[in-house]
Amino acid sequence: MKSQSLIEDEIPVKENYAYQIPTSPLIVEVTPQERNILSNVGALLEKAFKSYENPDYIEALHLYSFQLLPERIARILSRFGTDFSADQYGAIIFRGLLEVDQDHLGPTPANWQSADYSKLNKYGFICSLLHGAVPSKPVQYYAQRKGGGILHAVIPDEKMAATQTGSGSKTNLYVHTEDAFLLHQADFLSFLYLRNEERVPSTLYSVRSHGKVNKIMEKLFDPIYQCPKDANYQEEINDGPLASVLYGNKKLPFIRFDAAEQIFNENAGQTPEALYNLTEFWNEAKELINSDYIPDSGDVIFVNNHLCAHGRSAFTAGQKEENGKLVPCERRQMLRMMSKTSLIHIRSMTHTDDPYFVMEEHLGKVFDQA
């Protein structure tokens, strides 16, 4: 395997670009007026529809998004939905989007299975409006929690602390695009931080941060790579279908990537050529990871899942630093929502009776609905 120094010698370090290579997400400072509008809208929708999964609400979601969201936020998201350009990082941080009532939220549950979704209802409405403005439609995946609804609470679980999952905490969660093992993975993701008292940085990596596609990246268009299921699955399958890591436009590609499962999983079953290519790519990509942002309560990170991978740093759940000492605190709690821009294109993969329920198991294989 080539050394990092040899790799760097082969890649042009300085090129003249007609655009600014994006290395960090756009940060939108939400105004107090916009925050107040969103709070009132969430309460209004909760009163009118009871649940953010109400079919009458979901089927008219795009209309409500453009009617009720603050205009500036709706315009930002609408542009974001079709911007695949060279200078688009693929993630937006809405700083201070919501005021989270910590007393109403109560103590963080032990795990996501114990989450009280009656306390999260208002946040589900607001997150869904953001997706609706793209416009994109909130969906759930059988491959994740056997569905579990369109809003998932992500909570550190002591029993899963060392895993490469959202429930983990004690190890760095390698950057990954959500559900890289699916052909019909989510198009857009939202991460609403209800609390992050441990001050855990969010890690982001954009395929656009490389600048132009180089020789290392060109090899990733070949459909020779294993995309194993993630650490939520117990079985180890190393002879699954193959796929490319980069896809779409050859000059401005999309990415399907999970460093933990494709490179560091000893049972991934990559061929020597595939593993070599992935490792060379990772040596370059890991230097482009952005870990500068520490989310606060009420912040939302909105991600194009075809452009930008996400992860997080390791942390000690329920412990924060204060005056140089670790003291107890409420554990981190986040809400994730996923969406697809078209239900037509995924119909062969969705439940017969619910086009919002994606039944894909692994790179085009569908779970048995019987």
Curated annotation (Swiss-Prot):
Known uses: Being totally regio- and stereoselective, this enzyme is of interest for biocatalytic purposes to produce chiral scaffolds that are of synthetic value in the preparation of more complex functionalized chiral molecules such as natural products and analogs.
Cofactor note: Binds 1 Fe(2+) ion per subunit.
EC id: 1.14.11.-
Example of a GO MF term: 2-oxoglutarate-dependent dioxygenase activity
Role, per record: Alpha-ketoglutarate-dependent dioxygenase that in vitro catalyzes the regio- and stereoselective hydroxylation of L-lysine, leading to (4R)-4-hydroxy-L-lysine. To a lesser extent, can also use (3S)-3-hydroxy-L-lysine as substrate, producing the dihydroxylated product (3R,4R)-3,4-hydroxy-L-lysine. Cannot use D-lysine or L-ornithine as substrate.
Binding positions for Fe cation per the UniProt entry: 176, 178, 310
Main EC class the enzyme belongs to: oxidoreductase
Protein name: L-lysine 4-hydroxylase
InterPro entries named in the record: TauD-like_sf
Cofactor(s) demanded: Fe(2+)
Keywords tagged on the record: Dioxygenase, Iron, Metal-binding, Oxidoreductase
Catalysed reactions listed for this entry: L-lysine + 2-oxoglutarate + O2 = (4R)-4-hydroxy-L-lysine + succinate + CO2
